[in-house]
């Protein structure tokens, strides 16, 4: 019974020792003065982005800070601010600038492309005949494929 009493007596003595042994509390970053914070922030920023490299690394960001914000502009306002295009880029949309119906424009462009078909100058009748021949070949090919498929599956055992 003496031992438990000694342990109990030692515990209160050890408790004050832990209080005395505590290391001094360091100041949290929130409690530091603003001057210390700003100097630390500047040094960390300088490590990552030295001032001489900033314009090279982030030119868009720097330019965007100088520009006044353009907020509240609707799509109509943005399009009205642009000058109208006189000629579309790369010839895209030329047909919109030309006058006449689709058939008229097609008839005008036909002579330009007449010789482009495999280097041959074909009349309309010849082109129609060639198209009919191709369609007939496709039909015959499809019929043969269907016949082959049916013949394969009509047997009681696989080939």
Curated annotation (Swiss-Prot):
Chain segments carrying region Disordered: 1-97
UniProt gene name: TCEAL1
Phenotypic consequence of residue 116 to N: In HIJRS; uncertain significance
Native source species: Homo sapiens
Compartments where found: Nucleus
Comp. bias regions, Acidic residues: 37-54
Tissue expression per record: Expressed in all tissues examined. Highly expressed in heart, ovary, prostate and skeletal muscle. Moderately expressed in brain, placenta, testis and small intestine. Weakly expressed in lung, liver and spleen. Expressed in several cancer cell lines.
Keyword Transcription: yes
Primary role: May be involved in transcriptional regulation. Modulates various viral and cellular promoters in a promoter context-dependent manner. For example, transcription from the FOS promoter is increased, while Rous sarcoma virus (RSV) long terminal repeat (LTR) promoter activity is repressed. Does not bind DNA directly.
Keywords: Disease variant, Intellectual disability, Nucleus, Phosphoprotein, Transcription, Transcription regulation
GO CC list: nucleoplasm; nucleus
Record PTM Phosphoserine, positions in chain: 28, 33, 38-39, 43-44
Broad class of where this protein is predominantly found: nucleus
Pfam families, alphabetized: BEX
Involvement in disease: Hijazi-Reis syndrome: A neurodevelopmental disorder characterized by hypotonia, abnormal gait, developmental delay, intellectual disability especially affecting expressive language, and autistic behavior. Additional features include facial dysmorphism,ocular anomalies, and gastrointestinal issues. Rare patients have seizures. Disease severity is variable. Males tend to be more severely affected than females.
InterPro entries in the record: TF_A-like/BEX
Protein name: Transcription elongation factor A protein-like 1
Similarity remark: Belongs to the TFS-II family. TFA subfamily.
Domain of life: Eukaryota
Post-translational modification (record): Phosphorylation of Ser-38 and Ser-39 is critical for transcriptional repression.
Presence of the UniProt keyword Transcription in the record: yes
Compositional bias annotation for Basic and acidic residues: 17-34, 64-80
């Amino acid at each position: 019974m003496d031992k438990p009493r000694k342990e109990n007596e030692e515990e209160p003595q050890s408790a004050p020792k832990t209080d005395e042994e505590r290391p001094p509390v360091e100041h949290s970053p929130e409690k530091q003065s603003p001057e210390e914070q700003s100097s630390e922030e500047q040094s960390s920023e300088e490590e990552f982005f030295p001032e001489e490299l900033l314009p090279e690394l982030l030119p868009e960001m720097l330019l965007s800070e100088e520009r006044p914000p353009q907020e509240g502009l609707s799509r109509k306002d943005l399009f009205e601010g642009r000058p109208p295009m006189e000629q579309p880029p790369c010839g895209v949309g030329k047909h919109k600038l030309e006058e006449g119906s689709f058939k008229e424009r097609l008839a005008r462009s036909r002579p330009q492309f007449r010789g482009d078909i495999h280097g041959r100058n074909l009349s309309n009748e010849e082109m129609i005949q060639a198209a009919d021949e191709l369609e007939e070949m496709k039909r015959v090919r499809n019929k043969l494929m269907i016949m082959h498929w049916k013949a394969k599956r009509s047997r009681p055992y696989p080939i």
